Protein backbone atom coordinates (compact mmCIF):
# COMPACT_ATOMS: atom_id res chain seq x y z
CA UNK A 1 0.00 0.00 0.00
CA UNK A 2 1.42 3.34 -1.09
CA UNK A 3 0.92 6.03 1.55
CA UNK A 4 1.42 9.79 1.83
CA UNK A 5 4.79 9.41 3.58
CA UNK A 6 6.37 7.39 0.78
CA UNK A 7 9.09 9.14 -1.21
CA UNK A 8 8.05 10.10 -4.74
CA UNK A 9 11.21 8.81 -6.42
CA UNK A 10 11.03 5.51 -4.53
CA UNK A 11 7.45 4.94 -5.66
CA UNK A 12 8.48 5.39 -9.30
CA UNK A 13 11.42 3.06 -8.77
CA UNK A 14 9.12 0.34 -7.40
CA UNK A 15 6.25 1.03 -9.82
CA UNK A 16 7.56 2.68 -13.01
CA UNK A 17 4.03 3.37 -14.31
CA UNK A 18 3.50 5.70 -11.35
CA UNK A 19 5.65 8.18 -13.29
CA UNK A 20 2.69 8.81 -15.60
CA UNK A 21 0.48 9.74 -12.65
CA UNK A 22 3.00 12.09 -11.08
CA UNK A 23 3.63 13.67 -14.47
CA UNK A 24 -0.10 14.24 -15.03
CA UNK A 25 -0.30 16.43 -11.91
CA UNK A 26 3.05 18.15 -12.41
CA UNK A 27 4.97 16.42 -9.61
CA UNK A 28 8.70 16.05 -10.26
CA UNK A 29 9.81 12.45 -9.69
CA UNK A 30 13.22 13.08 -11.20
CA UNK A 31 15.76 15.51 -9.69
CA UNK A 32 13.18 16.78 -7.19
CA UNK A 33 11.80 13.38 -6.28
CA UNK A 34 13.33 12.99 -2.81
CA UNK A 35 10.24 14.29 -1.01
CA UNK A 36 7.15 12.59 0.36
CA UNK A 37 4.00 12.30 -1.72
CA UNK A 38 2.24 14.53 0.78
CA UNK A 39 4.91 17.26 0.59
CA UNK A 40 4.96 17.13 -3.20
CA UNK A 41 1.18 17.40 -3.43
CA UNK A 42 1.10 20.40 -1.10
CA UNK A 43 3.39 22.28 -3.49
CA UNK A 44 0.85 21.88 -6.30
CA UNK A 45 -2.50 23.58 -6.60
CA UNK A 46 -5.59 21.51 -7.34
CA UNK A 47 -3.95 18.20 -6.37
CA UNK A 48 -6.17 16.13 -4.10
CA UNK A 49 -3.87 13.96 -1.97
CA UNK A 50 -6.44 11.22 -1.36
CA UNK A 51 -7.31 10.99 -5.04
CA UNK A 52 -3.62 10.90 -5.95
CA UNK A 53 -2.97 8.07 -3.48
CA UNK A 54 -5.93 6.13 -4.88
CA UNK A 55 -4.55 6.42 -8.41
CA UNK A 56 -1.10 5.35 -7.24
CA UNK A 57 -2.47 2.34 -5.40
CA UNK A 58 -4.46 1.34 -8.46
CA UNK A 59 -1.14 1.23 -10.34
CA UNK A 60 0.42 -0.85 -7.56
CA UNK A 61 -2.40 -3.40 -7.74
CA UNK A 62 -2.22 -3.67 -11.52
CA UNK A 63 1.57 -4.01 -11.62
CA UNK A 64 2.24 -6.90 -14.01
CA UNK A 65 3.99 -9.84 -12.29
CA UNK A 66 7.16 -10.83 -14.07
CA UNK A 67 7.51 -7.54 -15.95
CA UNK A 68 11.00 -6.10 -16.03
CA UNK A 69 11.78 -3.68 -13.24
CA UNK A 70 15.26 -2.23 -13.76
CA UNK A 71 15.84 -1.88 -10.02
CA UNK A 72 16.48 -5.63 -9.84
CA UNK A 73 19.29 -5.52 -12.42
CA UNK A 74 22.92 -5.45 -11.36
CA UNK A 75 25.02 -2.42 -12.26
CA UNK A 76 26.43 -3.69 -15.55
CA UNK A 77 23.04 -5.01 -16.75
CA UNK A 78 21.32 -1.79 -15.71
CA UNK A 79 23.89 0.26 -17.63
CA UNK A 80 23.26 -1.85 -20.73
CA UNK A 81 19.53 -1.29 -20.26
CA UNK A 82 19.98 2.48 -19.94
CA UNK A 83 22.14 2.64 -23.04
CA UNK A 84 19.66 0.61 -25.11
CA UNK A 85 16.47 2.20 -23.78
CA UNK A 86 17.62 5.82 -23.50
CA UNK A 87 21.04 6.70 -24.90
CA UNK A 88 20.56 5.28 -28.38
CA UNK A 89 16.91 6.43 -28.78
CA UNK A 90 17.86 9.94 -27.62
CA UNK A 91 20.72 10.17 -30.08
CA UNK A 92 18.43 9.05 -32.89
CA UNK A 93 15.68 11.48 -31.92
CA UNK A 94 18.07 14.42 -31.71
CA UNK A 95 19.28 13.63 -35.22
CA UNK A 96 15.74 13.43 -36.59
CA UNK A 97 14.11 16.25 -34.63
CA UNK A 98 16.75 18.98 -35.00
CA UNK A 99 15.90 19.89 -38.63
CA UNK A 100 12.27 20.49 -37.66
CA UNK A 101 13.21 22.69 -34.69
CA UNK A 102 15.51 24.68 -36.98
CA UNK A 103 12.81 25.05 -39.62
CA UNK A 104 10.24 26.19 -37.06
CA UNK A 105 12.58 28.88 -35.74
CA UNK A 106 13.56 30.07 -39.22
CA UNK A 107 10.03 30.24 -40.66
CA UNK A 108 8.02 31.45 -37.66
CA UNK A 109 10.69 32.94 -35.41
CA UNK A 110 10.55 36.44 -36.98
CA UNK A 111 6.91 36.80 -35.87
CA UNK A 112 7.22 34.67 -32.73
CA UNK A 113 10.60 35.43 -31.09
CA UNK A 114 10.09 32.82 -28.38
CA UNK A 115 10.54 30.15 -31.06
CA UNK A 116 14.05 31.45 -31.65
CA UNK A 117 14.72 31.18 -27.92
CA UNK A 118 13.20 27.70 -27.99
CA UNK A 119 15.67 26.61 -30.66
CA UNK A 120 18.59 28.07 -28.71
CA UNK A 121 17.46 26.28 -25.55
CA UNK A 122 16.90 23.04 -27.45
CA UNK A 123 20.37 23.25 -28.98
CA UNK A 124 21.92 23.76 -25.54
CA UNK A 125 19.91 20.83 -24.20
CA UNK A 126 20.78 18.58 -27.14
CA UNK A 127 24.49 19.37 -27.16
CA UNK A 128 24.72 18.97 -23.40
CA UNK A 129 22.93 15.64 -23.44
CA UNK A 130 25.01 14.26 -26.30
CA UNK A 131 28.23 15.22 -24.52
CA UNK A 132 26.91 13.91 -21.20
CA UNK A 133 25.84 10.54 -22.60
CA UNK A 134 29.11 10.06 -24.48
CA UNK A 135 31.10 10.77 -21.32
CA UNK A 136 28.93 8.32 -19.40
CA UNK A 137 29.47 5.61 -22.02
CA UNK A 138 33.21 6.17 -22.38
CA UNK A 139 34.33 7.16 -18.88
CA UNK A 140 31.77 7.11 -16.08
CA UNK A 141 29.88 3.87 -16.68
CA UNK A 142 33.09 1.81 -16.95
CA UNK A 143 34.09 3.21 -13.54
CA UNK A 144 30.74 2.16 -12.05
CA UNK A 145 31.19 -1.35 -13.44
CA UNK A 146 34.73 -1.56 -12.02
CA UNK A 147 33.36 -0.46 -8.64
CA UNK A 148 30.67 -3.16 -8.80
CA UNK A 149 33.38 -5.75 -9.54
CA UNK A 150 35.25 -4.79 -6.39
CA UNK A 151 37.96 -2.63 -7.89
CA UNK A 152 39.02 0.55 -6.10
CA UNK A 153 37.63 3.68 -7.76
CA UNK A 154 38.86 6.59 -5.64
CA UNK A 155 36.69 9.24 -7.28
CA UNK A 156 33.41 7.28 -7.39
CA UNK A 157 31.53 9.84 -5.26
CA UNK A 158 32.83 12.71 -7.39
CA UNK A 159 31.72 10.88 -10.54
CA UNK A 160 28.19 10.52 -9.18
CA UNK A 161 28.03 14.10 -7.86
CA UNK A 162 29.11 15.48 -11.24
CA UNK A 163 26.53 13.40 -13.11
CA UNK A 164 23.76 14.49 -10.76
CA UNK A 165 24.79 18.13 -11.28
CA UNK A 166 24.54 17.60 -15.03
CA UNK A 167 21.08 16.13 -14.56
CA UNK A 168 19.94 19.16 -12.57
CA UNK A 169 21.10 21.47 -15.36
CA UNK A 170 19.29 19.29 -17.88
CA UNK A 171 16.11 19.51 -15.83
CA UNK A 172 16.31 23.30 -15.80
CA UNK A 173 16.52 23.38 -19.60
CA UNK A 174 13.49 21.10 -19.85
CA UNK A 175 11.55 23.46 -17.59
CA UNK A 176 12.54 26.40 -19.77
CA UNK A 177 11.40 24.67 -22.96
CA UNK A 178 8.12 23.73 -21.32
CA UNK A 179 7.59 27.32 -20.18
CA UNK A 180 8.39 28.73 -23.63
CA UNK A 181 5.83 26.44 -25.24
CA UNK A 182 3.07 26.73 -22.61
CA UNK A 183 3.65 23.07 -21.69
CA UNK A 184 3.87 22.16 -25.38
CA UNK A 185 0.42 23.49 -26.26
CA UNK A 186 0.61 24.85 -29.83
CA UNK A 187 -1.36 27.99 -30.70
CA UNK A 188 -4.47 27.72 -32.86
CA UNK A 189 -2.62 29.01 -35.91
CA UNK A 190 0.20 26.46 -35.58
CA UNK A 191 1.16 24.64 -38.78
CA UNK A 192 1.94 20.94 -39.03
CA UNK A 193 5.66 21.38 -38.35
CA UNK A 194 4.90 23.51 -35.31
CA UNK A 195 2.61 20.85 -33.86
CA UNK A 196 5.07 18.10 -34.71
CA UNK A 197 7.91 19.87 -32.90
CA UNK A 198 5.84 20.44 -29.78
CA UNK A 199 4.61 16.86 -29.74
CA UNK A 200 8.09 15.42 -30.08
CA UNK A 201 9.65 17.84 -27.58
CA UNK A 202 7.05 16.72 -25.05
CA UNK A 203 7.91 13.07 -25.74
CA UNK A 204 11.59 13.96 -25.40
CA UNK A 205 10.89 15.48 -22.00
CA UNK A 206 9.13 12.30 -20.86
CA UNK A 207 11.99 10.10 -22.07
CA UNK A 208 14.60 12.30 -20.39
CA UNK A 209 12.76 12.37 -17.06
CA UNK A 210 12.57 8.57 -17.05
CA UNK A 211 16.23 8.35 -18.06
CA UNK A 212 17.45 10.69 -15.32
CA UNK A 213 15.25 9.08 -12.67
CA UNK A 214 16.69 5.67 -13.45
CA UNK A 215 20.24 6.93 -13.10
CA UNK A 216 19.76 9.17 -10.06
CA UNK A 217 17.50 6.93 -8.01
CA UNK A 218 18.41 3.40 -9.11
CA UNK A 219 21.85 3.17 -10.73
CA UNK A 220 23.72 5.61 -8.51
CA UNK A 221 22.20 4.15 -5.34
CA UNK A 222 23.72 0.79 -6.23
CA UNK A 223 27.23 2.23 -6.07
CA UNK A 224 26.96 4.82 -3.32
UniProtKB/Swiss-Prot annotation:
Q: Which GO terms describe its cellular component?
A: cytoplasm
Sorted alphabetically, which Pfam families does this protein's record hold?
Answer: Hemerythrin (PF01814), ScdA_N (PF04405)
Q: Which InterPro entries match?
A: Hemerythrin-like, RIC_family, ScdA, ScdA-like_N_sf
| Native source organism of the sequence | Staphylococcus aureus (strain MSSA476)
Q: Which UniProt keywords apply?
A: Cytoplasm, Iron, Metal-binding, Stress response
The record's note on quaternary structure and interaction partners says: Homodimer.
- Briefly state the protein's biological role: Di-iron-containing protein involved in the repair of iron-sulfur clusters damaged by oxidative and nitrosative stress conditions.
Metal-binding in keyword set: yes
Q: Tell me which family the UniProt entry assigns to this protein.
A: Belongs to the RIC family. ScdA subfamily.
- GO terms of molecular function: metal ion binding
The signal peptide annotation in the UniProt record is none
This protein is called: Iron-sulfur cluster repair protein ScdA
Under PANTHER family, the record lists: IRON-SULFUR CLUSTER REPAIR PROTEIN YTFE
Q: Which cysteines are joined by disulfide bonds?
A: none
Q: Where is this protein found?
A: Cytoplasm
Main site of residence? Answer: cytoplasm
